[in-house]
Amino acid sequence: MGTYRVAVYAICKNEAQFARRWMASMSEADRVIVLDTGSEDGTPDILHELGADVTREQVEPWRFDTARNRSLALVPGNMDICVCTDLDEVFRPGWRAALERAWCPGVGQAHYPYIWSFTADGKDGVVFWADKIHARHGWHWAGPVHEILRSDAPVRAVFVPDIRLEHHPDPAKSRGQYLPLLELAVAEEPENDRNVHYLGREYLFYGRWDDCIATLQRHLAMPSATWRDERAASMRYIAKAYQEKGEGG
């Protein structure tokens, strides 16, 4: 199709409602490869019908990094560029051409705008740079939840503002698996400020006010916790927890 061989890869479970929209968005790739981890709603059949290569496999015990690494392993070794997305995400059209314009020999990763949420009137809400486009070899996923890509060697990256990935989640989707995985993630890497922040936020969602406050105060005290947006969020969550405890000002 183009200068480089591009493969999209993903994991999924019970996401039939997103399957057709996602496949339409990912169709600019040469290959679409999916690891289905136990769907009961026909998701694999829809994806296969629309041209995806689907493998079904249970991942036990569940960890997102294990599932992502297994899905990445399904990508043929002769692909040049791997694009990891979730089924509740869509690229704006033209992403493949934008990627090929920016990619060149020696590049190992692409960063691109990720529209995580939208305002009530449909405008971009929270936007940050995502980094889940990478060369086929020399990469792996790490972390039981909120997993991140890690490279085996120093990486040359390119920034591609013309690629726009949008997040359109199911608001009814259960968060039940996240808390134990976040607790595991922090136990494995106690100094990972990002996961400490996420754990404190999760305690807020569960109404565990004291755990929320203690965890986020620890986050704010960590020397590595320098991202202003995340620090501000921790402060807001602490204030909310105190308010829920009846101790707000």
What are these regions (language model features)?
Residues 80-91:
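The conserved acidic donor/metal-binding loop of glycosyltransferases
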Residues 17-20, 41-50, 94:
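Acidic helix N-cap motif at the loop->helix transition within catalytic regions
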